[in-house]
Amino acid sequence: MLFVINLFFYHFWLLALGITGLNVLIMRLWAQKFITAQPELAEGYRQLFWGMLFYLGLPWLVMGFGIVVGGVPAPLYFLDPKTGNPFVLTFHLTLVFLWLLGFMWIYFWDGAEFYVKYITPLRRSSILTRSPLGVKIMAAISFGAGLIGLVTLWLFDFPGPGF
């Protein structure tokens, strides 16, 4: 049983990458009715799905590279950037890069409008994400929460396996 648990944790990044791909595939299937009704939306949805694979998949690929090639023993080690492990630091820099990219997209590159046009119809969205201003408010909350989480990882010591 311990072997199965260790195998799961060692390959967690691969499972997360697979779930990311599955989510994108499901959203693509949901979008098909919108593309059929309005074929001019096809290019925007294509950009959306490739963007999602990049934005949501890159951190898991970086983590997997660190585990398989870099000798990081398990995904839990990525919660302790203070170790100075270059693969763990690269993972955290990747997150910061993606947050900056997401921030620029939402606030300066019409990402909020794109979100309302392409993503809001795919899901039962909250009232906030039905307008570009609401998307920007939700993005600010999300970016703020992520920043608090990242700073917490750098400032506090968390006991755990291998720490």
PLM feature segments, named:
Residues Y10, L79-Y118:
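Short alpha-helical packing/oligomerization segments
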Residues M1-F3, R46-F91:
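Long, highly hydrophobic alpha-helical transmembrane signal-anchor segments
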Residues L25-G44, A74-L76, Y107-R130:
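Cytoplasmic membrane-interface regions of multi-pass membrane proteins
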Residues G44-L58, S125-L147:
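Loop-to-transmembrane boundary segments
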Residues L17-V24, W60-L61, L93-L100, M104, ...:
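Hydrophobic alpha-helical transmembrane segments of multipass integral membrane proteins
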Residues M1-F8, P161-F163:
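Short, strongly hydrophobic alpha-helical membrane anchors
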